[in-house]
From Swiss-Prot:
Organism: Shewanella loihica (strain ATCC BAA-1088 / PV-4)
Record-given protein name: D-alanine--D-alanine ligase
Gene name of the record: ddl
PANTHER family on file: D-ALANINE--D-ALANINE LIGASE, D-ALANINE--D-ALANINE LIGASE A
Keyword Manganese listed: yes
Any one GO molecular function term: metal ion binding
Binding site for ATP: 154-209
Domain ATP-grasp: 124-329
Function: Cell wall formation.
Cofactor note: Binds 2 magnesium or manganese ions per subunit.
Length: 334
C-alpha cells in the first residue's frame, strides 16, 4: 500500500480550542499505530493562521497541499484530513464545506449534518420530525421585551428552564434559570454567543450518553454510559474539563435492558435519519418515570482523557485505531 499523507488539523481558535488540542493528542497516538500513514499535525488559530507541530507557519491550499512559509520546504500533498476541531469551525459545517469545495476527503460528519446538529433549534426540529422524544422548548431570535416575556412565561409554566445559545457546544452559553429576575441578564449573555437562543424545560433526570459510529458496514450504538454531576448540578463546560471537577462517569449505565435498547434504537434512528457519518456522541435524559428524551448530538465528540466516547467504543469491543483505519481507507476508496 502506498503511504497516505494525513493532515491532523486541530485547534480552530474558538471557545473549545484547548479541548481540541487534547483530542488531537488521542488521534495522534491512535494514528501512530497505523504505519502506512504519514501524519502531519497542524494547528489552526483564531486568525486563520496555520502552524505545524514543529513550529513552521503554513497554509492549506485549494490544491490540497500544505505550503510552508519557509519556501525551502517542499509543499506537502494532503490525501485525507481529520478536522479535530470542537465547536467553530469544526462542528458547525464551515470547515467541511471548504473540504468539499476543494474535493478533499475528510473524517467525520459532512457539512449539512454538522450544521443541523450544531444548531440546537434545527436539531430539535429534526428530532421531532423523526419521532424521537426531546425536551419541551421555545426559541428566540432577538433580545427584546417579547423574548423576556416569553421566557418569563416558560419559567412560570415549567418551574425552571435552561437558556441556551443555539449555536454553541460543550455547554458554552448555557444557563439554568430558577428566578425571573435572572432572565434579562442571562438572555443577554446567551445572545452574546449566538443570534438564536433556545429556552428548554429543566428536566430532572439522569444524563446518559451513547457512542455511535459506522464500522464494518453498520451503524453501531454502544450501551449507554452515564454522567453523574455532584449534587444534581448541570454538566457545565467547567464541570466537563476542570481539573477539580466533581462530576463522575460510568462507561455502562445501570439501567434496565429495555431502557438501554430503546436508547440505542433512538440513537441509531437519529444518526441514520439525519445522515450523519463516521461518529457522533448522542446524549439523552432518563427521567425518574422512565421517560427517554433526546438531548443533543455532538458530531465530533471529545477524545480527551476524561471523554466517554473512546471508553464506550473500547467497552463495545472495538479498537479505535482499526476503526479509524477503515474510515480512512473507505474514504479514499482503497
Amino acid at each position: 500500500m502506498n503511504p497516505i499523507n494525513l493532515l491532523l488539523l486541530c485547534g480552530g481558535g474558538g471557545d473549545e480550542h484547548a479541548i481540541s488540542l487534547l483530542s488531537a493528542n488521542y488521534f495522534e497516538t491512535s494514528l501512530a499505530k497505523l504505519p502506512h500513514l504519514n501524519v502531519l499535525r497542524v494547528e489552526l488559530d483564531a486568525k486563520g493562521q496555520y502552524q505545524s507541530k514543529s513550529g513552521e507557519r503554513c497554509e492549506l491550499t485549494n490544491r490540497r497541499e500544505i505550503r510552508f512559509e519557509d519556501e525551502s520546504l517542499a509543499p506537502w500533498p494532503v490525501d485525507y484530513v481529520i478536522p479535530c476541531i470542537h465547536g467553530y469551525p469544526g462542528e458547525t459545517g464551515d470547515i467541511q464545506s471548504y473540504f468539499e469545495l476543494i474535493n478533499l476527503p475528510y473524517f467525520g460528519c459532512d457539512a449539512e449534518g454538522s450544521r443541523n446538529c450544531f444548531n440546537k433549534i434545527t436539531a430539535k426540529m429534526w428530532f421531532s420530525a423523526l419521532g424521537i422524544p426531546n425536551t419541551p422548548y421555545l426559541f428566540l431570535n432577538q433580545l427584546d421585551e417579547q423574548a423576556i416575556a416569553q421566557t418569563t412565561d416558560a419559567l412560570a409554566k415549567w418551574g425552571s428552564v435552561f437558556v441556551k445559545a443555539a449555536s454553541q457546544g460543550s455547554s458554552v452559553g448555557c444557563y439554568r434559570v430558577d428566578d425571573a429576575a435572572q432572565i434579562p441578564a442571562i438572555l443577554a449573555d446567551a445572545f452574546h454567543y449566538s443570534p438564536y437562543v433556545v429556552v428548554e424545560k429543566t428536566i430532572q433526570a439522569r444524563e446518559l450518553e451513547v457512542a455511535v459510529y459506522q464500522y464494518r458496514g453498520e451503524t453501531v450504538a454502544t450501551l449507554p454510559g452515564e454522567v453523574i454531576c455532584a449534587g444534581g448540578t448541570f454538566y457545565t463546560y467547567d464541570e466537563k474539563y476542570a481539573a477539580d471537577s466533581k462530576a463522575t462517569t460510568k462507561v455502562v449505565a445501570e439501567v434496565s435492558d429495555e431502557i438501554a435498547q430503546q436508547i440505542r434504537a433512538y440513537a441509531v434512528k437519529v444518526f441514520d435519519g439525519m445522515k450523519l457519518r463516521h461518529l457522533s456522541r448522542i446524549d439523552f435524559f432518563l427521567t425518574p418515570e422512565g421517560e427517554i428524551l433526546l438531548n443533543e448530538i455532538n458530531t465530533f465528540p471529545g477524545l480527551t482523557p476524561i471523554s466517554m466516547f473512546p471508553k464506550m467504543l473500547a467497552n463495545h469491543g472495538d479498537d479505535f485505531s482499526q476503526y479509524l483505519n477503515e474510515a480512512i481507507l473507505t474514504g479514499l476508496n482503497r
